[in-house]
Amino acid sequence: MTFCPRFSRRVSECESIIAYEFNSKSLCAQALNTAADSMSVCVLDGSIKKIPKNDRLAVYGDAAAAAYLCSLWIKGGLPKPDSQDCWTTLRRDLISNDNLTRVGREHGLDKCINMNGGTTRVSSGMVATALEAILGAVEIDGGRDALARVMKHLGLTEHALLGSVKFFPLDNLTHLICIGAFSAAMEFPRRPRPVIPGFA
């Protein structure tokens, strides 16, 4: 698979930083792409293709990273009275936008991001979104174990509440429990209930 030099260099640098080689280079390119103009166009295997923005991959990556982190929380057997506070703290300290931005910049992932023409500065939001998208792309490309290795490599599983975390492959039951816990913890904007005449 042949990329234009702009994406090829970024993909190679990203793979080196996260210590993971993608089977699908185009998936990694999408994770790194914030552009919607001509800067998102590349030549792929002789054909002109527009690489999608990374926002959807970022949503997926956020959920995947939270599910794996939740598995470490559950396997850690933290005391029940403090468990909810512990989970909130882990999410805030490890996979919040602020920490993802810090991790992304410290590892140099901000230099891999493809931006719109005329954009000269990589914002904090771009870095956090790109890292979420990278994690999502890794999970899609290599599965849950690949995601676990990349998160550990980037320090996204290092926390005093977890102690010294070793590599934990996710079994299916723990994965399902974690997805449920993550979904329950998310806060969605609630619409007011419609008032129907004759009903309370």
What are the residue ranges of the model-derived segments?
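Double-stranded RNA-binding/processing signature
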Residues: 1-200
